[in-house]
Amino acid sequence: MPFVELETNLPASRIPAGLENRLCAATATILDKPEDRVSVTIRPGMTLLMNKSTEPCAHLLVSSIGVVGTAEQNRTHSASFFKFLTEELSLDQDRIVIRFFPLEAWQIGKKGTVMTFL
């Protein structure tokens, strides 16, 4: 059950229409998870400073069970997410940062319980 959160200082007017759907599909492909299990949040218009600059930038937070826990996995994921984000948001790679958070099944609540018991 991947969670993807895109935070950017780009105004909402610069976020391409349908980005949430394309990011969901890309995440499912990149992490090899079913698309109907991916949760996407996009937060435009945030106040962000990166490398001492407020020029357009983005932070991507990727959390999931079992697929973001090693450097080898995340190197591959990173390359794919960077390709997607640079194309979709027209940002240079040095204006994007990705953070990966491995989750355990007991850390995600669903249907009145946690994923461990589903």
Curated annotation (Swiss-Prot):
Family listed: Belongs to the MIF family.
PROSITE patterns for this protein: MIF
Catalytic activity, reaction form: D-dopachrome + H(+) = 5,6-dihydroxyindole + CO2
Pfam families, alphabetized: MIF (PF01187)
Protein name (database record): D-dopachrome decarboxylase
One of the GO BP terms on file: positive regulation of inflammatory response
Highest taxon of source: Eukaryota
GO cellular component, one term: extracellular space
Gene name for this UniProt entry: Ddt
Subcellular localization(s) per the UniProt record: Cytoplasm
Role played: Tautomerization of D-dopachrome with decarboxylation to give 5,6-dihydroxyindole (DHI).
Modified residues (Phosphoserine): S90
EC primary class: lyase
InterPro entries per UniProt: Macrophage_inhib_fac, Macrophage_inhib_fac_CS, Tautomerase/MIF_sf
Phylogenetic classification of the source organism: Eukaryota, Metazoa, Chordata, Craniata, Vertebrata
Species, as recorded: Mus musculus
UniProt subunit comment: Homotrimer.
N6-acetyllysine: residues bearing it: K33
EC number: 4.1.1.84
Keywords (A to Z) from UniProt: Acetylation, Cytoplasm, Lyase, Melanin biosynthesis, Phosphoprotein
Residue numbers bearing the N-acetylproline modification: P2
Molecular function, one GO term: D-dopachrome decarboxylase activity
